[in-house]
């Protein structure tokens, strides 16, 4: 029997994950009191294979009952029952945005002090996070990307040895994306904005792309950038990191950063990674440029 404990920060996407797991044959129970884990596992083991994949969502909604989780997991281990822990998290800014959009109340912030509730929750969950088998940060994942990550982990034959890489082009005048692990400033490349024929085009247009890539310093930068990510990604994976967010910035986020991001996207797509790209500031009218 495969026993999975799902926990993590409120608002990080546990409900979505449960849906994806149910779709691939997991028997899921939401908000189970930790004291019942052992009993429930015994029942499943006695089902003669009818229940072979189980996912239990256990989080701070249980209040003080959550304190029983670690002792109960230790008891499972002592009784010879194997389990895995999936821990979901997201950045404070993303969690606050999700709560405001959903208008839901955080379990530890009934008075509305969201940031205080999130901070308290992180402290409570710190020990279980350290023992997690898998940690997924959903801050920069679309539902489709999150589903792909779940399938990669829990569907036999779907697991891959690469990394989920998100590339974000942006304009420094609009701020650096808070979710970035790495940020590269490409404002050293001559700016197509000042050439009339390219001023209102973007780095996705061939004329702009060819212009940006025509400089010797661009070619040297791309060589060094490729070498760096080829060095970093395997070492990140070795340390247990499964996602990487790379930011590429220029002044306005329409020309140079877009062209460089597209080039990096094409390069990484040829590797064993799942790569996504988002031109955050290419168009400020709200249209999505993610793929």
UniProtKB/Swiss-Prot annotation:
Keywords: ATP-binding, GTP-binding, Nucleotide-binding. GTP binds at residues 59-62. GO terms for molecular function: ATP binding; GTP binding. ATP binds at residues 8-15. Gene3D superfamilies: P-loop containing nucleotide triphosphate hydrolases. It holds the Pfam family RapZ-like_N. InterPro entries: P-loop_NTPase, RapZ-like, RapZ-like_N, RapZ_C. Belongs to the RapZ-like family. PANTHER family: RNASE ADAPTER PROTEIN RAPZ. NCBIfam families: PRK05416.1. Displays ATPase and GTPase activities. This is Nucleotide-binding protein Cthe_0113. It comes from Acetivibrio thermocellus (strain ATCC 27405 / DSM 1237 / JCM 9322 / NBRC 103400 / NCIMB 10682 / NRRL B-4536 / VPI 7372) (Clostridium thermocellum).
